Each structure stands twice: as C-alpha cells, then as structure tokens.
Amino acid sequence: MNLATTKAKLKSGAQAGVQALNKAGHAAKTGTVAAGKATVAGAKSLYLTIPKDYDIEKGGSLNELIKAADELGIARLQEDANNIESAKKSIDTVEKLLSFTQTGVAVSAKKLDELLQKYSSSQLAKSLGSSANIDSKLTKTNHILSTLSSFLGTALAGMDLDSLVKQGDASATDLAKASLDLINELVNNISNSVQSIEAFSEQLGRLGAAISQTKGLSGLGNKLQNLPNFGKANLALEMISGLLSGISAGFTLADKNASTEKKVAAGFELSNQVIGNVTKAISSYVLAQRAAAGLSTTGAVASLITASIMLAISPLAFMNAADKFKNASLIDEFAKQFKKFGYDGDSLLAEYQRGAGTIEASLTAINTALGAVSAGVSAAAVGSVVGSPVALLVAGVTGLISGILEASKQAMFESVANRLQSKILAWEKENGGKNYFENGYDARHAHYLERNLKLLSELNKELQAERVIAITQQRWDANIGELAGITKLGDRISSGKAYADAFEDGKKLDGASNVTVDTRTGVVDISNANGKKTQALHFTSPLLTAGTETRERVQNGKYSYINQLKFNRVKSWTVKDGEANSRLDFSKVIQHVAFNDEDGRLSGKTEEIALNVNAGSGNDDIFAGQGKMNVDGGTGHDRVFYSKDGGLGQVNVDGTKATEAGSYTVNRSINNGSFYHEVIKRQTTQVGKRTETLEYRDFELKRPEHGYQTTDTLKSVEEIVGSQFSDTFKGSKFADIFHGGDGNDTLEGNDGDDRLFGGNGDDHLYGGNGDDLLDGGKGNDVINGGDGNDVYISRKGDGNDTLYDSHGSDKLAFADADLSELTIERTAQGIMIKRNDGSGSINMAEWYKTLSQQNYHGNATDDKIEQIIGKNGDYITSEQIDKLLKDKQTGTITSAQLQQLAQENKSKSIDSGNLASTLNKLIESMASFGSRGATASNYLQPAHKSPQNVLAPSAV
C-alpha cells in the first residue's frame, strides 16, 4: 500500500481534523501559532512548572505535586525569565493553569496547588481526587496530574499522526502502527465502558501515559514491534491486546443485565448503566478542567456541556454490537445440543459474533469516547482563550483517528473470519476430508432423531407395519449457511441432506437397514424388508428433487460475492419395493420445480418430476404424490390412492384400452390448495463491508393460478381409490375395483367382474357386462348393474338410491338390516324399499317396465332383482313381491309379511352354488376393504371379521 492510497483512504476522516487544525492556527494570536508550531515540531512534552523562588529542599505545599510529577514521568521545569515570561506575553496566560512553551505544554504547579486548595471541599474535587478508589499508590495530586497528562497526551499523539500525514514521506507501516497503537490503548481501556468518574480518569491517565512516552513514533510499544506492514491485518489484530478476547466479558453491553432492550429506542439514551455514566464522567471531567482554569462552572454551563456530550453519543451505534453479543450467547446455548453429535460449527458462529461484536463495540466506544471528549472540550472552551485552540485541535485529532479506524475495520472482521476458516479446514483434514458443513447436517439429523424418537417409534403402530422406513429431508440451515458465508466457503455447502431410518417393532435400527436413498441418481431401494412381511415408506418432511449440486463463488462487487448454484437435476425418482406388503406414501415428495427469472423472482415456469414405482410382489398400497406417477404394481393385490388428505384434484381413470388386467391411464388435475414447489432462495451474510450471497434449494407451498394437469400410468394395479372431487372411472375388459371416494363420481365397470364403490356423494355406478358388485355408499346414488349376475350392497345411512337392473340373476343385500326392518311399497311402475328407521330407501322405479323400455344408460332392462337378502341370510324373491303387488296400483308389503315370506323360503331348496358365489363377493368386499374406511382414511384398514350368517345358505 503506497502513501497516496493511504492518504486517500484517510481523506474523509482526516478532512475535519485538518480543517480544525487550520482553524486553530488562525484563531489564536501570533504567539499562540508560533508556540503551537514549535510544540508540533518539538518533543511535545508535558511539564510541571515550579516557581523560580520555590525551594524544593525546604519543602512546601508544592512538594506533593512535584513528587507526583516525578512518579508519572512528567518533567519539572524551573521558571526563568526567558521562556515563561515570553510565553505569558505571547499567549496571554497570566495566572492561568496551562501555558505553551517552546518545548511543550506547561502546568503551573503554583496555580494548580491554589485551585486544589480552593476546591478541596467541593464534591467535584473529591470525585477527581478520590485516589484511594483507583490506586492506593496514587495521591490525589498524582491522579489529577495523570488526568491532565492523559488528555493532553492523547491530543499530542493525534498531532503526531497529523504531522506524519503532512510529511509526505511517511510509510504506510508507520501510519498503521500509529493508528493501531492508539486503537490498542483505547480498546484496552475505554471500550470496557466507564462506570465512574474515577475509572474514567484512570483510563485516560493510562492512555495518556502510554502515548506521551512515544517519541517520534519510533517506539510504539512491544505489542506492535513485529508488525511487518499494514496489509497483514491478521497479525495486526493478534498484536492488539484484548481486541478479540476479554473485552466481550467486560464490555457492559455484553452483560445480560445491561437492560439494553428495555432502555433503547431510536434517539433516546442507551441506558443509565452505559451512556449515562459516560456522560457523567466526561461532563465532570471537563467541568473540572474549567474549574482548574478558573472558568465558570454554573448550572447553565454544566447543562451545556452535558447536552453537547449527549449529542455526540449515538445510542443506536451501540445496538449493533449489543445484538452481536446477545446473538453469540443465544447461539452458544443453541450449539450445546449439537456438540455431542460432533458438530461445533454453531460455536464457531458464536465466536464470530463475539469477535464482530467486540470490533463493533471497541470502535463504537472509541469513537463515542473521542466524540464525547471533543464535544465536552468544545463546550468547556466557551469563554476561554486557551481552550478554543485546544478544542479545535481535539476535534481535528478525533476526525483523523476516526478515518484511520474506519480504514482498518474491514481487516479486523476478515481476521476473525480467516481464523474460523482455518479451524474448519483443519477439522476436515483431521477427519479424512469429510465436508464440515455436511457434518453439520448430520448433527442436526441426529438431534432430530433424539428429540422425536418416541413419535417415530410409534409409526409402526400407526401405519400398521412391522417395518417403517422414515425418510427425512434436512433442509437448508441458516446457521450453517451463515458460517459458510463468513468463512468464504460457500462453494462447499449443500442445500441439505436426505436421511433414511428404519424402525422395526417400535425400535430404531442402529445398524444397516438395507435401505438406499441416493439423492444423486434419484433411486430409493427398500426391496430388502429384512424379513418383515409388512413395511411402510414414510416421508417425514418434503423431499427435494434428486441431482448433483455445485457452486461457484463469484465476485460481483468491490466487497460483494455470490455463490452461484448449479444443479444437474434428475428428472424422476425411482422407488424399488420387494416382497413385503408395503404402504408407499409419496404425498410429501416434491414433484414441481419453480424457476426464477434473471432478477431472482419466480418466473411462473415450472418443471414436473416423475415418480417411477416398482412395487414388486406383495399387496401394496400406493398413495399418489403431487405430480406424474408411473406405477408397476407387480404381483399381489395392489391399490393406488388418490384420496390422501382429500386428494389434489379431479381424477379420470381410463382402462378401456387396456390389454392386460390392472392397466390404466389416469388423467388428473392438481389444483386443490397449495403444493410443494422446489425453489431457489438466497441467503446474504454480512462480514463488515463484505457480503456473501449463497444460493440454495428449498421448498415452498404455492398455489398455482390454474393448477396442473398430469397423467399417471398404472400397471398391475388391482384397485383404485378416487379423490374428494367428482371423479370418473372407466373400467377395462378385465375385473376392475374402483372407489369413488368423496364427490359426485361416475364409475363404469364395462366388461369383467367389477367391484364399484361410490363412497360419499351422489354417484352413478354402472356395472356393464360381468358379475359385478355395486355399493353406492352414502348419498343419493343411481346404480345399474347391467348384464350379469350382479350383487348390490345397501347399508344404513346410504341415502335414497335409485337402482336399475337388466338381465342376469341379481341380488340386493342389506348388510346391516333384517328383512323385518324393511317395508316395500308399490309405485307407479315400480317398487320402493324403505328402511323402517328412515335411514334410507331404494327406488326401483322401472321394476314393472317391459324389456322394450330403456334405462338411463340406453340399455333395455327388466329392472327386477331376483333376490332381496337380509343380514342374516333370509331372503325373498322377485316372484313373491310380484304376487303381492303386480296387479295393484298401490300397496305395501309390511315387515311382518316380509318376515313371513323369508320364513317360507327357509324350507325351499335354493341354488347353493349361486348363493355361495354371492356370499364370497360380499365377504371379500367387506373383509378386504371397507368402502367407508377406504375412501376416508389415509391408512391401511384392518380386516373386518367376516359377517356372521350373511347370505348363509339355508339347510337343504
């Protein structure tokens, strides 16, 4: 760094100082200017002047002052006619405390002694002179001299810096050493906060003593001797004692009892503990100067000084530092729960917060102290000939120092960040190259398992599976991301990590679980169920899309960097199942990616990620996700559910083109509510002036304006469950099993022996050809079995259904009612079967229509059900009904008559084979899948016990 660069960086901070120094020269008399120049050019010492006729050997009231000066290293100067008299004439300081000489600033021992005696009884003098509270070795006189020395020493040190800048040949190293020497003393003394007048005076005394001993900036202290140049900020910080250690413990704002949050508001005082005491201390100090100089210390003057100091103190400047210390404490507490899992990154983050807080606190305290002193001295200088140039000098010095500090600030932050980076890289080297931030995700997941182990262990019972595979996506972690940004390692972090944990019999498997979740290739393999017959694949959180991430750290401004994400995405997930009866729930797998435009905002463009499911053997239940799904059910009885949480939108199932059983095309709408979308987000971390922006993948719930349309392909799927919307099912030429779920659905079996369950809603069920089983469910349904020997199921609460039938030997079974609980009434061209409790009815309006008539589906029908069966197997026939009602316009078959007819049938021989087939259909339907539970529940349904005596054949 050359001098020109250094001067440019200091220009803004030094400008005020140079202007103030120039004003000081013009404001004083000619003698003052000459004396000031001589002081700058000379040794610039502080002297204690002793009257020429004072005899030290004989002793007197001044001996105490002389002894104190000797202890403090303040030179004694015996008055003579030459230098003292000329000084008095030139700057008009007759009978004043302070005066300039050719070799420095003189303090009149005589005048000081008089002032001490004059004000010895005042509270102010007692405060300034309470040496016992500071150091038992210092007398009151010693302490006051130390205070004066400290203030003037600070000013003289600033003049040294100014003279270096003006020389034009000073090196950057000299400037850095000068500024850092001042920083060192201010940080170690002032930044710990001022709690009393005595402490403030003591700190200034030490500061002045250290700087006043500096001669020509050649010997700047042992701590900075090895500083090679200004650019080596790391070493510079380490050389500054206490900057990065110790201060946070002593700094008042770090104390949780400082009440910063309660006492701070924009434009108001920080708190009495901090700024109040600083104000009191500096006010008392400058008032003492005025008293010592013989100036007024009235209440009005004191108020002016206090007001000036308060205006120089910014409460909000302290808040940033206070927040960092507070955050560090919170992060430290947060870090404890992850340390036992081998991750210390949160502690590193807290370490940075403390370091940054220390820097902010130190520099804020320095600038606050300098600004307050400058303001106080300026206020105290009112009415003082000597005070005015001194005040201007102090203002100039503080402006210059502030500029130097600001130029050094970024290097301080980077030193802390670089130290943390070194720790991270050292850890990776010690741990075989493992990624430090990935280790952070591992610790987060281990903590998640520990905290939620009880709930996770209950999944076996909840999902009714001997084995549960829980897949958890640890998403982007702000703390881990912030640490990566601070340490300039943002290109080494990932957006998260997916984990698979196996639970068997309520216990987590600690060893190998025979599960593979490869987020790079998009393969999830759970085909080895570890000998268990039932298992469930459960996603505890939304799973990000598969692929490979890379990042590149690019500079996009002087202090600005962006870690750009590049993602090679796999277009689908593949899930492999094995022999177990598995429950595969994909409702939390993210299947839509939302893209951003060049400005980082969502563009509205999306990409769909497919799910390929190879279910293997076993009876599997597959819950559809939020996007395209290709399912191969394999062997076994497999079911696909579109009913999870009510479903995502309307489902249209089409099996009309199937060439093999279980093959369907499902066109569905995804427009109900909000869906998971993978998005690119950004996190920005501030390190002083440097900003680090990290791009990462995350997910959000979004509701697209028009929704999505997608198409699923199902193969070897035996059963499909619809949504809460109005779904359409069209069966194949094979046996189909459809459940409408909620909504007003349309189910058509077409060919094959189909099972159609309407579920809730006003549904239309049409069996078509084949021996079908039709269950309308709740709602007012329209049901037509079509050709074949069909079975209709009715339950309590099903609503008022309309039933059509054509051809075949058909049966209507009341699963929960005896015939004695029913009544049959004649209608215009048909009959109405009513439940006596009013819970539902079945209207067969075309029972008596001829075959020339057509039903609503356009097919001819005789609309008669050959047998009506009660829950205990009692039955009546269509012929028995016709005998009682055919030739009547109105009429009723009572419950008693129905019971009598059923009793007569018990002694008759019936077709046991036909009845057994009907019985099997009903039992299988009720035992393997309860239509109520199937459409409403998200989980496997427990097998119902076979209904006793339902359709049981009578003894023959």
From Swiss-Prot:
As recorded in Swiss-Prot or TrEMBL, the protein's gene is named rtxA
Where found in the cell? Secreted; Host cell membrane
Q: Which InterPro entries does the entry mention? A: Hemolysin-typ_Ca-bd_CS, Hemolysn_Ca-bd, RTX_C, RTX_pore_form, RTX_toxin/Mannuronan_C5-epim, RTX_toxin_determinant-A, Serralysin-like_metalloprot_C
Spans of repeat Hemolysin-type calcium-binding: 613-639, 722-756, 757-791
Lipid modification N6-myristoyl lysine sits where? K558, K689
Lipoprotein as a keyword?
A: yes
* Phenotype when changing Y54F: Does not affect cytolytic ability
Q: How does it sit in the membrane?
A: Multi-pass membrane protein
User: Which domain of life does the protein's organism represent?
Assistant: Bacteria
Which segments carry the region annotation Cholesterol recognition/amino acid consensus (CRAC) region 2?
Answer: 349-354
PROSITE patterns referenced in this protein's UniProt entry, alphabetically: HEMOLYSIN_CALCIUM
Q: Which GO terms describe its biological process?
A: killing of cells of another organism
Q: Which organism does this sequence originate in?
A: Kingella kingae
Q: Alphabetically list the UniProt keywords.
A: Cytolysis, Host cell membrane, Host membrane, Lipoprotein, Membrane, Myristate, Repeat, Secreted, Toxin, Virulence
Q: What does this protein do?
A: Bacterial cytolysin that attacks host cell membranes and causes cell rupture by forming a pore. Binds and permeabilizes target cells by forming cation-selective pores. Constitutes the key virulence cytotoxin of K.kingae. Binds cholesterol and oligosaccharides on the surface of host cells. Does not bind beta-2 integrin (ITGB2) on the host cell surface.
Q: Where is this region: Cholesterol recognition/amino acid consensus (CRAC) region 1?
A: 48-58
Q: Where mainly found?
A: secreted
Kindly provide the name given to this protein in its UniProt entry. Cytolysin RtxA
Q: Which GO terms describe its cellular component?
A: extracellular region; host cell membrane; host cell plasma membrane; membrane
- Record-linked SUPFAM superfamilies: beta-Roll
- Mod. after translation: Myristoylated by RtxC; the toxin only becomes active when modified. Mainly myristoylated; a very minor fraction is acylated with hydroxymyristoyl, lauroyl and palmitoleyl chains fatty acyl groups. Fatty acylation is involved in binding to host membranes and promotes the irreversible insertion of RtxA into the host cell membrane.
